[in-house]
Design a protein with these regions (language model features):
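NTP/phosphate- and nucleic-acid-binding module
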Residues: 1-313
Length: 313
């Protein structure tokens, strides 16, 4: 859940923690009462009307609720998934029995998720329906922090290999008091967008919480038998979780540039990294009506063509 506050003057609703962040405060790990107190001490103003009169912060359920069938009652209530992770955990035993993987191993998935965001915005960065990419990486208990650091390193290498680097990319580790109840270490990968720091990926060590809960309520044995050590245990999980839509938007933001051509003229340029650019290079003859030049351009293009990445015109 997120901390919801209402402006008493204009009735607009906001996330209290985001208002505090925008004002330079740190709401991480704060209770609802502490969120309310921080908003008062920082004298936060409503982004819509400028008033500084908000309701007390209260928890807001992010899950979309609906009903199966024609009768709306508690027994038919269902929810749209807020993440793809749980579908992976429910299929853990199927994957193990079918593929017989060796520890450590991962299961990856990309798909739609739905969250009833209080304040969607910043184009596709924060929406109520979005695409998620998640990996549940199963490891031996006691090695999860080592694997957490491994995935942080791999994530940094991946983002930097596609052009996101420098002081606009940061890896922010959660303080102990700000960790989710299931996690013993979490790191957020954030990028400095025009609207502030935004999370692109969360890398969480989820311990064995999820598999334990699914085992408890399903009655299925979700333990793993290590033949080499002759031991049985419930695997721990390290989860790299990406927002696909916001990551694509961030690549576009990072590539966007406006060049000053002088004399009051400018042009907009999209400097995409070569690895994600749809066109790597183009050979363009200056004169289409001179066969010699056109033929030479085509010959050069054929020499450098790799698949369909280089196009001649």
């Amino acid at each position: 859940s997120d901390p919801l506050v209402d402006c008493k003057k204009c009735r607009e609703r906001f996330r209290g923690d985001k208002l505090i962040e925008d004002a330079g405060g740190d709401p991480v790990g704060k209770t609802l009462a502490e969120i309310s107190a921080m908003m008062q001490s920082l004298r936060i103003k409503c982004p819509s009307c400028g008033a500084s009169d908000f309701t007390e912060a209260r928890a807001f359920n992010l899950m979309f609720r609906t009903f199966q069938g024609v009768v709306e009652e508690s027994s038919t209530a269902i929810y749209l998934r807020p993440e793809t992770a749980q579908g992976i955990f429910t299929n853990f035993k199927n994957v193990v029995n079918s593929l017989h993987p060796k520890m450590p191993f991962g299961i990856a998935q990309i798909g739609k998720s739905f969250r009833n965001e209080i304040t969607p915005g910043n184009f596709t960065f924060r929406t109520r329906e979005f695409e998620q990419m998640e990996i549940e990486f199963f490891v031996e208990p006691g090695t999860e922090l080592e694997w957490h650091d491994y995935w942080c390193k791999k994530s940094r290498e991946w983002f930097e290999s596609l052009g996101l680097a420098g002081d606009k990319l940061r890896f922010r580790e959660h303080a102990a008091e700000a960790l989710s109840h299931y996690s013993n270490k979490t790191t957020d990968v954030e990028y400095l967008c025009p609207f502030g720091w935004g999370e692109l990926e969360g890398i969480a060590s989820r311990t064995d919480f999820d598999l334990k809960r699914h085992q408890e309520f399903s009655g299925e044995d979700l333990t793993w038998f290590d033949q080499e050590k002759n031991t049985r245990y419930i695997p721990y999980v390290v989860e790299p979780s990406f927002g696909a839509d916001r990551t694509v938007l961030t690549f576009l933001i990072n590539a966007y540039a406006e060049e000053d051509l002088g004399e009051g003229k400018s042009r907009t340029v999209l400097r995409l990294h070569p690895r994600i650019a749809p066109v790597k290079a183009a050979i363009l003859p200056l004169k289409k009506n001179e066969p010699r030049i056109v033929e030479k351009a085509r010959a050069r293009s054929e020499e450098r063509r790799v698949g369909k990445e280089c196009r001649s015109r």
